[in-house]
């Protein structure tokens, strides 16, 4: 008798995706982040669902409803901080996942890569709208500053901003629609994840060497299921530690002050995971130029496959490219630090230099280095 997992119409899909899926035998822990992102999404949807049961999306009561969740709801504080810090964990896994893709040349699977970029934008939009919901000072002013950037679009900019706001400033209508979209988008993300996996399973996984591994495959279960479960435990332990010992470590104290349109905080900044893009935005004195640089800092990932001129897929055997990759990582850390600093000397010039270097490494230095490495190979 054939096993039910191979014959049942629904279980057959699960079986071919998670049980009998052929996977390269050499996958390292860097390949854990896809499944970790799935766990993060599940945690966010579950905690978000329970938070939405107690939250009210009205400017008069939003801040108090979050306080009520933390003080009066059974384990409401755990839900709230799991959700807030779960977002940080989500972005840590996202950035490591993208970094792994860049390092090992996974971007040559262009469909999977492009769906991944769409996912990145969707998660960023979701996180931004979620940050507005507690209706603290940083929520209000962050929403005002970031949505206002759209006014830089020629001709339709101002109308577009007012259309998003639902009025002439960030107010009740804005908060209500942001809550609606914040609730909806994670399910769009979940659907995109299915599409991402569909494309990935068409080609199969890449591996650290970048060499086709069709001749050396092992079943996903039990080898990689066990490996993934270890990843889950490590990540959930880190998340629990953060939530239980230092839940406000990554937050902004200004968000414990209710939103006040008449009082601007001294330093308006987004959550830490957007600081690198915010630093690039601020480093250009022109408003439209800054907005374009902000969008391009993420969208640049879409042209990375076109800039791949190396004869080797992975950076595993390309020491010069490795040096550039880690320089890029250092530049991103620098930008994240600068994004959280006030706009004054010497932070301005450091931010501008780091921004130029960011684009220079990806657009010019990496392709040139690949050409040099190709020449070295043929010697």
From Swiss-Prot:
One biological process term in Gene Ontology: mitochondrial electron transport, ubiquinol to cytochrome c
Q: Required co-factor?
A: heme b
User: By its UniProt entry, which SUPFAM superfamilies does this protein fall under?
Assistant: a domain/subunit of cytochrome bc1 complex (Ubiquinol-cytochrome c reductase), Transmembrane di-heme cytochromes
Q: Which residues form a coiled coil?
A: none
Matches recorded under InterPro entries: Cyt_b/b6_C, Cyt_b/b6_C_sf, Cyt_b/b6_N, Cytb/b6-like_sf, Cytochrome_b, Cytochrome_b_C_euk/bac, Cytochrome_b_N_euk/bac, Di-haem_cyt_TM
- Give the binding site residues for heme b b566: 97
Binding annotation for heme b b562: 83, 182
> Does the record carry Metal-binding as a key word?
yes
Give me the comment on cofactor binding.
Binds 2 heme b groups non-covalently.
Q: How does it sit in the membrane?
A: Multi-pass membrane protein
- Assigned GO CC terms: mitochondrial inner membrane; respiratory chain complex III
Q: Does the keyword ATP-binding apply?
A: no
TM ranges are 33-53, 77-98, 113-133, 178-198, 226-246, 288-308, 320-340, 347-367
Question: What are the alphabetically sorted keywords of the record?
Answer: Electron transport, Heme, Iron, Membrane, Metal-binding, Mitochondrion, Mitochondrion inner membrane, Respiratory chain, Transmembrane, Transmembrane helix, Transport, Ubiquinone
Q: What is its main location?
A: mitochondrion
The places in or outside the cell where this protein is found are: Mitochondrion inner membrane
Pfam families reported in the protein's UniProt record: Cytochrom_B_C, Cytochrome_B
Disulfide bonds, which pairs?
none
Q: Where does a ubiquinone bind?
A: 201
Its UniProt miscellaneous note says: Heme 1 (or BL or b562) is low-potential and absorbs at about 562 nm, and heme 2 (or BH or b566) is high-potential and absorbs at about 566 nm.
Q: Which PANTHER family match?
A: CYTOCHROME B (PTHR19271:SF16)
Q: What does this protein do?
A: Component of the ubiquinol-cytochrome c reductase complex (complex III or cytochrome b-c1 complex) that is part of the mitochondrial respiratory chain. The b-c1 complex mediates electron transfer from ubiquinol to cytochrome c. Contributes to the generation of a proton gradient across the mitochondrial membrane that is then used for ATP synthesis.
The family note in this entry says:
Belongs to the cytochrome b family.
Q: How does it assemble?
A: The cytochrome bc1 complex contains 11 subunits: 3 respiratory subunits (MT-CYB, CYC1 and UQCRFS1), 2 core proteins (UQCRC1 and UQCRC2) and 6 low-molecular weight proteins (UQCRH/QCR6, UQCRB/QCR7, UQCRQ/QCR8, UQCR10/QCR9, UQCR11/QCR10 and a cleavage product of UQCRFS1). This cytochrome bc1 complex then forms a dimer.
Query: In its UniProt entry, what is this protein called?
Result: Cytochrome b
